[in-house]
Amino acid sequence: VKDAAEQFLHISSDYWHENMVALAERLAALAPMGEPVMSFLCQSGTESVEGALKLARYVTGRPRFIGFLGGFHGRTMGSLSFTSSKYTQQKGFAPTMPGVTHVPYPNPYRPLFAGADQGKAVLDYIRMLFERNVPASEVAAIMIEPLQGEGGYLWPPEGFLAGLRALCDEHGILLIFDE
């Protein structure tokens, strides 16, 4: 702590410093892409979510999003639109950002789809939404916590995230992991 305090009295993402560059380079080396990777370093998780939402709309030109029930993504207006872990987070701030539809998180402990493979059932539910209520061609991104925290510390079933990735790829939808 003493060594860090001697280097920085205050840090922000407004100006680059050696440690930020080293972190960005390390993240780029770990990223599983075959193309150059850029990092967006910011002050908080909610700010990173806001950045991801803006980038998704900008890149795709699409207005809608899908989030998961039970998720916590922050308390700024965009991220709050995805936060559905407790109503108290949104109380007094309605309406939040339009265009966000929530779907069930595949919860093995409180299954919403009795007798079904929860992961497959949720993917089928999203497909049904695409056909009936939320056209896939209008969805910029789907945002999920790979490990849902406030929603009960839930891991999705094996294969669910890969299935969600495939569904997004099929429709040109970005997939945002907020972890």
PLM ranges: what are they?
Residues 1-66:
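Glycine-rich loop-to-alpha-helix module at the N-terminal edge of alpha/beta enzyme cores
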Residues 136, 154-179:
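Catalytic PLP-binding core of fold-type I/II PLP enzymes
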Residues 57-61, 81-90, 159-163:
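A glycine- and small-aliphatic-rich helix-loop capping segment at beta-alpha/alpha-beta transitions
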Residues 51-54, 60, 76-82, 113-115, ...:
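Short acidic, glycine/serine/threonine-rich loops at helix termini
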Residues 146-155:
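Glycine-rich, proline-tolerant flexible connector loops at the mouths of alpha/beta enzymes
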Residues 72-147:
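PLP-dependent aminotransferase-class I/II
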Residues 42, 52, 143, 176-177:
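Generic enzyme active-site microenvironment
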Residues 7, 34-37, 60-64, 76, ...:
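Short coil/turn connectors at secondary-structure junctions
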